[in-house]
Amino acid sequence: MRAEIENYVKKIEQSLELLWRSLDVESSTERLNELEELTSDPSLWNDQANAQTLLREKSNLEEKLNAFNKLKSNLKDTLELEEMAEAENDLETLSQIEQDLKNLSVIAAKFETECLFSGEADGNNCFLEINAGAGGTESHDWVSIMMRMYLRFAERLGFKTEIINMINGEEAGIKSCTIRIIGKRAYGWFKTEAGVHRLVRISPFNAAGKRMTSFASSWVYPEIDDNIAITIEDKDLRIDTFRASGAGGQHVNTTDSAVRITHIPTNTVTQCQSDRSQHKNKAQAMKMLQAKLYELEMQKRTDSVNEQNAAKTDNSWGHQIRSYVLQPYQMVKDLRTDYETSDTKGVLDGDLEDFVSASLAMNAGGRR
């Protein structure tokens, strides 16, 4: 077996071994058989809430076990083909097998990461909000770089994106933006990216070519679906409308279509100006508000256990999660997991999978 092929095979086999333990395949298969019996009972729908819960559990187990078995089967079939190609010294087929195994190793690594998703909202779409820290134009430019990085990351994962809100900087860059990320498990993939990000580089805006440090914060919250109940009273809301504006203060349109919603008890604010319809902007802003309030509630539960406050307050600016050093050397380092890479270009182009995997594994107690 050629060295490159052997390396990919080892990676996939290691992933399969970890997945076998993580999924607890034997117990999960037994539970799936049990769920199939329960959900085939006609009396199941006498309790609709319980029926929905059981069906979601069944669907989740089916998806994971099918993916595991498909991965295992694909590896077996590819190894059989590789054995025949080796015997015939079929270089063209061996080259294709190497590429197939490379692709399979990527799928295995992604599946391995997704098995660490455990939150009730991990499978949902999400919103990503990025805000500039102190530093003016330098920080505004850093927000625009981060926005591009996350758009590329979403694209790598096969997610769709919508820019819901964006406020441009006075000279360059972006003061703040909100992106909606659409796809299965989007929140699971993005949730560990919340925190403060520090950039060190030679400033393109400084004539003396000085090295500058910039900060920006990101906040991630899941889009709420019908399975999660969030109650918002009308009396707790203040709704303002205003004209959506573009760069340089120029109006995108001449109607008050942009909407800002304030949840008075928590002082949580959302706004949307992505559509010309005030009605659609209001609906999107309400979705974002539900998502933010859900995330705040989850943070309260976490705080009661960890005595940490990771909610979006001024203190969160001290919660630095990652540094991106471009000069005098090149290094991106996660300060929570100590995972680091010198491939700064790759990271800023959206190669974040290893950072996310390391964070999820740490949160799960080191399982990986």
From Swiss-Prot:
Post-translational modification as stated in the protein's UniProt record: Methylated by PrmC. Methylation increases the termination efficiency of RF2.
An annotated Gene Ontology molecular function: translation release factor activity, codon specific
Function comment: Peptide chain release factor 2 directs the termination of translation in response to the peptide chain termination codons UGA and UAA.
NCBIfam families referenced in this protein's UniProt entry, alphabetically: prfB (TIGR00020)
InterPro entries in alphabetical order: PCRF, Pep_chain_release_fac_I, Pep_chain_release_fac_I_sf, PrfB
Keywords of the record: Cytoplasm, Methylation, Protein biosynthesis
Gene: prfB
Residues found modified as N5-methylglutamine: Q250
The keyword Cytoplasm appears for this protein: yes
Full protein name: Peptide chain release factor 2
Similarity comment text for this entry: Belongs to the prokaryotic/mitochondrial release factor family.
Subcellular location(s) of the protein: Cytoplasm
Cited SUPFAM superfamilies: Release factor (SSF75620)
Pfam family, one: PCRF
GO terms under cellular component: cytoplasm
UniProt main location, coarse: cytoplasm
